[in-house]
Every structure is written in structure tokens, then in C-alpha cells.
Amino acid sequence: MSWKIQVCLIALLVLIGGNAANGQGKRKVIIDQDAAGPGGTDMQAILALVNSPDTEVLGITVLTGDAWRDEEVQHTLRLLEIIGRPDIPVLPGAVFPLVNSKEYMLGWEKLYGKQVYMGAWNFAKGYAVHGPYEIPPMPEGAPKIKASEEHASHFLRRMVRTYPHEVTIYAAGPMTDLALAIADDPEFAGLTKELIVMGGSINPTTDDPEFALSPTHEFNFWMDPEATRAVLHAKWPRLVLTTVDISVKTRMGKELIDEIRKSPTPAAQYVTKYAEPNILWDELAAVAWLDSSIITKWKMLYLDVDVGHGSGYGNTIVWPEGRQPGLGEIEGEVQDDLDKEKFYREFVELMARPTPRATKNEK
């Protein structure tokens, strides 16, 4: 190799390194999450995206889902303190669905039977029953940093206007914040780069009581069906879905927890302290976005949600090409199978690695 070529290669490497150090070339993402905590699938998905050296997390928008919004905001802020990323803004979003409510679902249960899981409405974390604006004692300690005063839907709209066609929206909770953004700005969806969704259920192979007898009834879709429908009818440049069907093929077991425990980083110690054996619902959606080669099989399907107020309220509806009704539903890339060993390996690496510091563009 001639000295001229060597000099050119060195200059190229320096340029690439400089761009990476300045945050250039990173994938911009907004995390829209129902961030129950401490630990668990919501927080571990946030960690995967924040800990990746290839992402620029513009902000974390938080709405009611697995827990009430204000409680989730506090857990998110505390997580960011623990891992040394207090610079990432946390934006409070929707407290309640557009139409659905706990009272409505209690009435629905009298007609159609008990729900297995109701998120904030059945207090799955075992805390004492509390109202939507109360914060129970936090096992990890209360945060010192504060959430932004900007509303999540406004932030979502502002970011896609600031970075048109560059921002990925990662949505792993109910769709209320996105529906509000769409209602306020009809061009919002088209100005994003893509929408990555953890939600929906088609025909999963599982003995999980939540889905074994009600295979299309998935929480993120049914908690706010009207919002889900608005999102699934918006004109996203690309729509990717991690449904229950593929999620139930994964598991956060003792072996993964023990592997993560070997790392001394604050992120790893946080994960192992609060980890619970469970399906890696949101983590799969996050890691598969970071490395799409984890997914080995896809289906192209048109999707919608049942907004009729009967037994199927909130259920996922799908059609293959040619059978969709043509009422505005769009086609999505539905993940169908994965390389589990590769996913587990990359998930452990993301949980265990040191959290990247904010670049000057991110501060």
C-alpha cells in the first residue's frame, strides 16, 4: 500500500471518528413508552436504546399504560440519573385514553368476562391502590432531576419538524400521544422516518393466560383503541410491528440475568437488581430496530383495531394484500420469527455495556 493511500485512509478514519464523536450519523429516535418501573420490560427497552452507541435519543415521552403516567415519569427520571444521562429530556404525555376508561372496562367485564391484565388499572406492580397523580414510594429512590414542562405530543411534532424524515418513533405503549400528535398536525406521520411499534396480537402460540383464549386482545392496542386506529391509519413512511406472536418466543430467565450481573456498570446493576423473569416484550422491538438481522422472517399485513363497543373492542385485525377493506389502513412489516441466540447476546451486551456519554450535539 502506497503512503498516499495510507494517509487517505487515516484521514477518512479520523473524519468518521470525529463525526461519531459529534453525534453525526447517529440514528435519531424518540422513545414513546409507558415506563413502569423500576426495572422490567419498559425500562430495559429504554436502556437498550440509550446504551446503544449508534442512537441519539432525542427524548422520552411517557404516558399511562402499565402504570400511571406521573409514576412512570419519576421512574424514568431516576433511571436516567442512575446511568448518568440526565441530559435526555423526559416529556409527560397522556394520563388517560381518548375514549376508553377503567370504569368502561369494568362495565365491559360484566358483559364479557374478566381481563387478565389491565396495566395501571389493576396495579400489576403490587403497590397500594392509588390515583393517577399520586407517586408511591420508589424502591430505587426519588429523582432529583425534573421532567420537561413541554407536553409529549407537542415535543413529538416539534422534533419531526426540526428533523424532517430523520426521526424514528419507537412506540411501546398505548398510542394516545401519537394520536394527539396526528390530530394536531396531519403531516406529522409523513414527516417521520418510520414508526416502530410493540403491540398487537394475531395468532400467538402460547399458554400465557392473557392470550391463550383471546389471541388478538393485546394491551397496548386495547387500552386506547381509538388512538390505535388513528395511528394505524396515518401515512407513516414505514411501519414495523413487534407483536405478541414473536415476543412470546423470548424469555428473560436466570441465565440472562446472571450474564448481565457480571458487568459492574450502573445500568447492569440496575437491571439485575430489579429484573423479573418475563417475556422480553419491548426489548425485542428495541433491539430488532438496532439490528434488523435478528429478525429472520417477516409478513406484510394490513392492520387495524376493532373500535366497535362489543366483545372484540380493542382486538387486532389483520389482512393480507388484496383482502383489506381499503378504508385507510396501511401495510406494516410484521415480525414473524427471530434468531433468539443473537438477540439474547445483543440484549445482554446492551444491558451490560457502559452508557455512552452525551455528545455535544445532545447536550
Q: What is the predicted role of each segment?
A:
Residues 88-146:
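Surface-exposed loop and adjacent secondary-structure segments within mature catalytic domains
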Residues 1-6:
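Positively charged n-region of N-terminal signal peptides that target proteins for export
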